[in-house]
Amino acid sequence: PKPSSAASDVYKRQLQGYVTGAARMPFEEQMDRMTAYVRKINDWALCDSPCSGFKFVRKHREEVWAFLQPYLYSGEVFSQRFAVVMLLAHFVTDDFIDRVLEACAAVRPSGYYASMAVAWAVSVCFAKYPEKTRPLLAGGRLDDETQNKAIQKIVDSFRVAEWDKSWVRTLRRPKERKS
């Protein structure tokens, strides 16, 4: 069966993201195309897979880090998700881990999908850099929803030791009761 026009539009937009990441072109053109692509993201699937394919970022981390900052603090859920997914895909490295953790602490997610991206990023940071990530989790800088989802992702991870999982469980926050 032929896909619906809405599904076809999603596939076309996702393909634009993949092409932007894979095509050989000058860095400035890739950045222009990435900027145009961010405006089209209105779904997690349009964000997550294409972002991980933006391999050109690894040769231009400082420039891309600066480019992502307005998106992190934009207050727009999918712009925030884009920026956070870019951080976890390309910046969880020895050189950037401290900045990534600070960004995760400072961003105020504007909706569920942004919050889940921050939780995912924190869990990836913990799996790779547990000692550096502990202060963020213990310090109360994440909102309750993001904190608890990060903890759940860490506990579910196969890359985290059992004793770390036990420690992380102690940091769960009670859910607010709805009246």
Give the residues covered by each predicted segment.
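A mid-sequence, solvent-exposed acidic-amphipathic segment
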Residues: 73-108
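Alpha-helix N-cap/helix-start positions at coil->helix boundaries
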Residues: 43-45, 77-78, 112-113, 144-148
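Hydrophobic, well-structured mid-protein blocks that either form specific transmembrane helices
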Residues: 29-83
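Eukaryotic acidic, Ser/Thr-rich intrinsically disordered low-complexity regions
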Residues: 135-179
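Glycine/small-residue-rich hydrophobic helix-like segments
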Residues: 109-143
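Amphipathic alpha-helical scaffolding segments comprising HEAT/armadillo-like alpha-solenoid repeats
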Residues: 5, 25-36, 59-70, 94-106, ...
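Single conserved hydrophobic/aromatic residue that forms the stacking wall/gate
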Residues: 1-7, 11
